[in-house]
Design a protein with these regions (language model features):
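Bacterial signal peptide processing site
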Residues: 20-23
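Beta-sandwich strand segments
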Residues: 84, 140-150
Length: 160
């Protein structure tokens, strides 16, 4: 009897979860407080290094809690389709992000960037310098990744 009750409870829970409409994150997530620029990654092998960086928050604009919310940040040069670095960020656990709530600020930097012996400002002004863009993707629970934003990286240095 207890076993049958437990089975019925699990089936009811599974049905109620799977019947909730999926949130279209391209509309259900607002990317807020966005800033981009070139992070001073210090000196590597005797050369100055700059990497593209983004700081952002996600705001839940839907009417549902978004459990296990994640972001994938993809860096690309504006002249190429090839990925130039990426990073995966877990924003919430099973507690989710409540409707109207905002995640803490996230700062993500590419692993790849530019190195040179010039000053950082001279590197940004170099004729060989290629600008970067950043694409943000989000997913929650077992949904598919959806693009929620794309940003160009201005030629500004982010101070530490």
């Amino acid at each position: 009897m207890v076993r049958a009750s437990l089975c019925a409870l699990f089936v009811a829970a599974a049905l109620s979860t799977s019947c909730a409409p999926k949130v279209d994150l391209s509309k259900g997530i607002q990317v807020v407080d966005v800033s981009t620029g070139w992070w001073d990654a210090g000196v590597v092998d005797g050369q100055n290094k700059l990497v593209p960086s983004i700081t952002f928050k996600f705001k839940n604009a839907s009417d549902q809690a978004l459990d296990v919310l994640q972001a994938n940040v993809v860096f690309r040069r504006v002249t190429e389709d090839k990925e130039w670095g990426s990073s995966f960020v877990k924003l919430t656990g099973t507690e989710g992000l409540a409707p109207g709530a905002t995640t803490p600020s996230q700062t993500v930097k590419s692993q790849l960037g530019y190195t040179g012996t010039e000053s950082r400002q001279q590197m940004l002004a170099n004729s060989q310098f290629v600008d970067a863009k950043i694409q943000l993707f989000a997913k929650y629970s077992n949904t598919q990744w959806q693009k929620v934003g794309e940003y160009t990286v201005p030629r500004t240095i982010i101070e530490k």
